[in-house]
Amino acid sequence: MAKSKNHTAHNQSAKAHKNGIKKPRRHRHTPTRGMDPKFLRNQRYARKHNVKAGENASAEE
C-alpha cells in the first residue's frame, strides 16, 4: 500500500481570500485581561503623567 500524503497547502490561500482577510476590529478600549501586569502598571503611570504643555498653565498663574 502506498504512503498517504501528510500535508498540503493547496487551495488554502484561495479559501482564505474568498471572503477577504480582515483585520480585527479596533475598539476604543482594548481589553487588558491577560496582559503583563508590570507593563499595565507602567502604562497607568504614563497615562497619569501624560499632560500637554499648555493645559495646566492657566491654573498656575
UniProtKB/Swiss-Prot annotation:
Modified residues (Phosphoserine): 58
Pfam families: Ribosomal_L29e
Entry keywords, A to Z: Phosphoprotein, Ribonucleoprotein, Ribosomal protein
GO MF, any single term: structural constituent of ribosome
GO CC terms of this entry: cytosolic large ribosomal subunit; nucleolus
Region (Disordered): 1-61
InterPro entries, A to Z: Ribosomal_eL29 (IPR002673)
Gene3D superfamilies for the chain: 6.10.140.1730
PANTHER family: 60S RIBOSOMAL PROTEIN L29 (PTHR12884), LARGE RIBOSOMAL SUBUNIT PROTEIN EL29Y-RELATED (PTHR12884:SF39)
Protein name: Large ribosomal subunit protein eL29z
Organism this protein belongs to: Arabidopsis thaliana (Mouse-ear cress)
Encoding gene per record: RPL29A
